[in-house]
Amino acid sequence: MCNTPTYCDLGKAAKDVFNKGYGFGMVKIDLRTKSCSGVEFSTSGHAYTDTGKASGNLETKYKICDHGLTFTQKWNTDNTLGTEISLENKLAEGLKLTLDTIFVPNTGKKSGKLKASYKRECFSIGSNVDIDFAGPTIYGWAVLALEGWLAGYQMSFDTAKSKLSQNNFALGYKAADFQLHTHVNDGTEFGGSIYQKVNEKIETSINLAWTAGSNNTRFGIAAKYKLDCRTSLSAKVNNASLIGLGYTQTLRPGVKLTLSALIDGKNFSAGGHKVGLGFELEA
C-alpha cells in the first residue's frame, strides 16, 4: 500500500471543494481521448472574456506498462515544448523517477528537472533538482502518516546563493469523511482548512489564512451539492464578499458542461461580475 499523500496533496479535499466546478471569466474546452495503440491525447483551450486573449495546450502520453515507463510530450501556444520520461514501480515498489525537460524554440532556452519520489503506507518522500550549471535549486519534501495524523515538511535550497529559499511545515488529520489541515510557510504565512463530507450528496469546506505582521486575514466557506449522479451545484464566499456559483451537468457519458459566475457582493449594482463556460469532452 502506497497511500500516503505528497506534501502538495495535503488538504487536497478542501482545495477541490473551493476550486473545482468554477472557471470565472473564461470560456474553456477540454478534450481527452485515447487511440487504439494506447496513446492518450489531451488538449485544452482557454479564451479570457475580459482581455480576449486565448491560449491552449496539447499533451500526448504513452505508457509501456511492462517496463513501468511513461513518455509525455507537451506543447502550448506560447511555443513551449516539454518532454517527460518517468519510471515507476520497477526499481522498487512505490519509487518513481522522472526526467522533465522544457525547450523554447523562439529563444533557445532550455531547462530541466530530475525528480524522485518514494511512497509507502506510513510515509512519502521526494526531491527535485533543477538542471542548471550556474547552481541548481534543490527541492525536497516528506510526509509521515500515523493513525490518521499527517505531518509534512517542504524545503528548497538555492545552491548558487547557499540559501534556504523555502521552509514550510504542515500538520493535519484525515478520516473517511473529515480532514483537518494546517500549515506554516517560511514562518510568516499561516493557514488552515477543514473538509467535511456530510453525506453522499453534500461536501463542505472552510479555509483560513493570514500573514504575520499584516491585518489581511482571508476566510472562505465553500460547499458542493450533488442533485443526482449527473448534476452538481457549487457555491463559495469569502470575507471580501466575493460570491462564486457553479453548475455542472453531465449531458451524456463523456460530455460535461460547467457554468460559473463570480459576483462582487460589495459592488453588486456596479457590474464587474464574471461568468464562465466550460466543456469537457472525453472519447
UniProtKB/Swiss-Prot annotation:
GO terms for biological process: sperm mitochondrial sheath assembly; spermatogenesis. The modification N6-acetyllysine is found at residues 12, 15, 20, 90, 266. This is Non-selective voltage-gated ion channel VDAC3. The modification Phosphoserine is found at residue 241. Ubiquitinated by PRKN during mitophagy, leading to its degradation and enhancement of mitophagy. Deubiquitinated by USP30. It comes from the Eukaryota. Keywords: Acetylation, Ion transport, Isopeptide bond, Membrane, Mitochondrion, Mitochondrion outer membrane, NAD, Nucleotide-binding, Phosphoprotein, Porin, Transmembrane, Transmembrane beta strand, Transport, Ubl conjugation. Consists mainly of a membrane-spanning beta-barrel formed by 19 beta-strands. Belongs to the eukaryotic mitochondrial porin family. Its main location: mitochondrion. Non-selective voltage-gated ion channel that mediates the transport of anions and cations through the mitochondrion outer membrane and plasma membrane. Forms a high-conducting channel with a stable open state and a voltage-induced closure with a mild preference for anions over cations. Involved in male fertility and sperm mitochondrial sheath formation. GO terms for molecular function: nucleotide binding; porin activity; voltage-gated monoatomic anion channel activity. Gene3D superfamilies: Porin.
